[in-house]
């Protein structure tokens, strides 16, 4: 994690069952884990590790691609993976049991920082609207069920996504 992200191998025509790293998902989840460790360090009075882990908790931002508005994988040299389809359920490649849509908005420890990655709150709202309104493309992956558009309620990391609307002061849809 020296670079702040886990590298994935660059490949094309990725099968959903091959052995990959799930690098985007792991980078996001490790950032959340680092935040939790930072809180423990702070509680123990370990200021040095608190600061280190809080800094590392921002690593999720290293894989945000502003040109697509998605978290996206990188290869070893730091360039974006070129064969990128936000609708494809890579299963292990870049995302674990997910696609780029399902990985949207996973930064439960830093929702405000995540929102700031977008150019405006309106851009966040538009992306959220697209998540729920863009039709699922019918890709088959046995762990992905319970869709509303591309929002997959059957995948735990997405359960907090609807509440992102309330963070941009749009609470009406989250009441339903």
Regions found by a protein language model. Name each.
Residues 38, 42-158:
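Catalytic cores of carbohydrate-active enzymes
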Residues 7, 82, 97, 168-170:
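Intrinsically disordered, low-complexity regions enriched in small/polar residues
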Residues 1-60, 64, 70:
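Active-site cavity-forming subdomains of large catalytic enzyme subunits
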Residues 24, 31, 105, 152-155, ...:
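Short, well-ordered coil↔helix boundary/capping segments
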Residues 166-176:
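Residue-level detector of conserved catalytic or cofactor/ligand-binding positions
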Residues 41, 164-165:
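Hydrophobic side-chain positions on well-ordered alpha-helices
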């Amino acid at each position: 994690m020296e670079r702040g992200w886990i590298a994935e191998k660059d490949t094309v025509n990725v099968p959903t069952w091959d052995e990959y790293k799930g690098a985007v998902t792991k980078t996001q989840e490790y950032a959340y884990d680092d935040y939790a460790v930072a809180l423990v360090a702070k509680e123990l009075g370990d200021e040095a590790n608190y600061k280190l882990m809080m800094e590392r908790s921002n690593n999720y931002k290293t894989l945000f691609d502003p040109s697509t508005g998605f978290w996206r994988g990188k290869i070893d040299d730091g360039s974006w993976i070129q064969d990128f389809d936000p609708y494809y359920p890579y299963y292990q490649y870049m995302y674990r049991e997910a696609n780029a849509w399902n990985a949207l908005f996973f930064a439960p420890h830093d929702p405000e920082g995540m929102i700031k990655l977008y150019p405006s709150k309106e851009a966040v709202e538009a992306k959220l609207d697209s998540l729920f309104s863009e039709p699922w493309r019918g890709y088959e992956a046995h762990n992905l069920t319970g869709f509303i558009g591309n929002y997959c309620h059957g995948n735990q990391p997405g359960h907090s996504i609807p509440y992102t609307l309330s963070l941009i002061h749009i609470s009406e849809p989250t009441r339903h």
